[in-house]
Swiss-Prot record:
Its main location: cytoplasm. The keyword Metal-binding does not apply. InterPro entries: PurM-like_C_dom, PurM-like_C_sf, PurM-like_N, PurM-like_N_sf, PurM_cligase. It catalyses: 2-formamido-N(1)-(5-O-phospho-beta-D-ribosyl)acetamidine + ATP = 5-amino-1-(5-phospho-beta-D-ribosyl)imidazole + ADP + phosphate + H(+). It comes from Photorhabdus laumondii subsp. laumondii (strain DSM 15139 / CIP 105565 / TT01) (Photorhabdus luminescens subsp. laumondii). Pathway: Purine metabolism; IMP biosynthesis via de novo pathway; 5-amino-1-(5-phospho-D-ribosyl)imidazole from N(2)-formyl-N(1)-(5-phospho-D-ribosyl)glycinamide: step 2/2. One of its GO terms (cellular component) is cytosol. The keyword ATP-binding applies. This is Phosphoribosylformylglycinamidine cyclo-ligase. The gene is purM.
Length: 346
């Protein structure tokens, strides 16, 4: 039977005018992320970007990520302004550990019903993250998909491309017994372990906005944006011989540190070298989470672990401190003995 009423895309739940309004809202913040290598602006079918001329043998490094169920917590608390920083951080931090300078970033924003204010807040956060990491936000996709997401719920994904000199790629191959390990402090749980965090909140019937921890709400602790280490690490890499860098994300200490270690080496972590930030003690105690599970799920206050020669430790910590990072020696590299794990926390 033919429908007598003329139907439009908007009747089906897709508002093209709202999408256009969003593009106009974000043009200004996107422009602030521009790099000289970027050709053209928003609106093209594809983004064009030249390689920086300073590289002799440039190798492109790419990465993609999301922010997991931290997004659900942000939506529940109606705090959308920093989730974009998280998105950029998760991508660019994975690039810089290989010595790569982030060049450009693209985002994907999908929702059941587009709320222009919410989307603009998220994308403004993405632009801020791009500025913090020195990369250009060159484009993205906003998908309004009624029936795929509940109401104004949304999901985000990020895609980043960086560049590194071929001879300066950091791949862990130089790591050897006797190397020192330096930690860089995290700003909070970053963007990992939030399904467990939300489970702990639910089981303990905790309101994160009404619960205070060290003069800040639990919500502030949990939604603190993921730290972006790009500029401080790129500066360090220029001045110090870095053997490996591990970004502590999903899988925590047990799974991320071995990703950059040769098979015959072991990372020995000195647990007494730092104190867990209060949020991790709260999570462990409230959720009755085992120590092993904490180190597997969370960063426990450590965002990056750097392997380098022991003679370079003092200089590296001085440089990182001057760059605004909190850094300390967290352990050493030893020869792996048969039957032992590649990471030991003692």
């Amino acid at each position: 039977m033919t429908n007598k009423t003329s139907l439009s895309y908007k009747d089906a739940g897709v508002d093209i005018d709202a999408g256009n309004a969003l593009v106009n809202r974000i043009k200004g913040v996107v422009k602030q992320t521009r790099r000289p290598e970027v050709m053209g602006g928003l609106g093209g079918f594809g983004a064009l970007c030249a390689l920086p001329q300073k590289y002799r043998e440039p190798i492109l490094v790419s990465g993609t990520d999301g922010v997991g169920t931290k997004l659900r917590l942000a939506m529940d608390l109606k705090r959308h302004d920093t989730i974009g920083i998280d998105l950029v951080a998760m991508c660019v931090n994975d690039l810089v550990v290989q010595g790569a300078e982030p060049l450009f970033f693209l985002d994907y924003y999908a929702t059941g019903k587009l709320d222009v204010d919410t989307a603009a807040s998220v994308i403004s956060g993405i632009a801020e993250g791009c500025q913090l990491s020195g990369c250009a936000l060159v484009g993205g996709e906003t998908a309004e998909m009624p029936g795929m997401y509940h109401g104004e719920d949304y999901d985000v994904a990020g895609f980043c491309v960086g560049v590194v000199e071929k001879s300066e790629i950091i791949d862990g191959s130089k790591v050897q017994a006797g190397d020192a390990l330096i930690a860089l402090a995290a700003s909070g749980p970053h963007s990992n372990g939030y399904s467990l965090i939300r489970k702990i909140l639910a089981v303990s019937n905790t309101d994160p906005e009404a619960t205070e921890l060290e003069s800040k709400s639990l919500a502030d602790h949990l939604l603190a944006p993921t730290k972006i280490y790009v500029k401080s690490l790129l500066s360090l890499i220029e001045q110090v011989d870095i053997h490996a860098i591990a970004h502590l994300t999903g899988g925590g200490f047990w799974e991320n540190i071995p990703r950059v270690l040769p098979e015959n080496t072991q990372a020995q972590i000195n647990e007494s070298s730092w104190q867990w930030p209060a949020i991790f003690n709260w999570l462990q105690q409230t959720g009755n989470v085992s120590r092993h599970e904490m180190y597997r799920t969370f960063n426990c206050g450590v965002g990056m672990v750097i392997a380098l020669p022991p003679t370079a430790v003092e200089q590296a910590i001085e440089l990182l401190t001057a760059a605004g990072e909190k850094a300390w020696q967290i352990g050493t590299i030893a020869t792996l003995k048969e039957g032992e794990q590649q990471v030991v926390i003692q």
